[in-house]
Amino acid sequence: MSFKIEDIKNLNTQWPMPTSKKKIVIIGAGGIVKDAHLPAYQKGEYKVHGIYDLEESKAKKCAEDHSIDNVYQNLDDALNEKNIILDIAVPPAVLLDIVKKIPKNSICQLQKPVGNSLEEA
């Protein structure tokens, strides 16, 4: 298959918004969540249902600033919500431990590599 520069005009650069929106649960309350994910969800009119972070105070602050109804005190409660999309934005060192706990058939978005090196991943 060959690619021609003229083909660029046929590339889809915008996709339609979903007709039904699932609840979003965020794992991690660091800078990328505060500065990028939450503003993007707000712009797309997505409601974030809940947030969890090892540092509960960070999750509470994000919840207050972005009108998030649920702050989970433990990871299992967040992961076991039904009919959700998981947004996982944690450091690579802990990502794999979280991924192993995700229920089967879950929809999730991962933000980091699954390890600190190729060997770990």
Regions found by a protein language model. Give the residues of each.
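N-terminal Rossmann-like dinucleotide-binding module
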Residues: 2-66
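Beta-loop-alpha module in the N-terminal Rossmann-like domain of NAD(P)-dependent dehydrogenases
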Residues: 66, 70-121
